[in-house]
């Protein structure tokens, strides 16, 4: 298992621990135009849940690996938080935003790991 795969699974586990909704891991490694090796995608019920999910992913990944995300976007409005760990990008949405952007359909050729 690669370091990136371990990180993706760790992020998904952290999202599960805080009741993230419909947590998925997309393996993008076989896609030519993919911006990362893995996407981890989840939803929260309300903005405070989305923020709490992001905080927990950050805490769990930092404790286990020592890594901080290179960039975090969307934290202030907490409708779609993107956490960039280079080869792993974590997307945490409010459900309506997830339904609107449909990342799983956009990257439908990616292998679903869960």
Where are these regions (language model features)?
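Polybasic/polar functional segments that serve as interface/processing modules
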Residues: 1-35, 43-81, 95-97, 103-114
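Active-site beta-strand termini and strand-to-loop segments that position acidic
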Residues: 83-85
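Conserved acidic residues
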Residues: 37, 87
């Amino acid at each position: 298992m690669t370091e990136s795969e371990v990180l993706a699974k760790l992020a998904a586990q952290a999202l599960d621990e805080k009741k993230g909704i419909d947590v998925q891991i997309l393996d993008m490694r076989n896609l030519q135009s993919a911006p990362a090796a893995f996407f981890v995608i989840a939803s929260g019920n309300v903005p405070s849940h989305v923020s709490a999910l992001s905080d927990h992913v950050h805490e769990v990944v930092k404790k286990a690996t020592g890594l901080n995300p290179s960039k975090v976007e969307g934290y202030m409005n907490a409708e779609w938080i993107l956490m960039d760990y280079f080869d792993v990008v974590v997307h945490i949405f409010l459900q309506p935003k997830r339904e609107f952007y449909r990342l799983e359909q956009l990257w439908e050729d990616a292998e679903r790991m869960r």
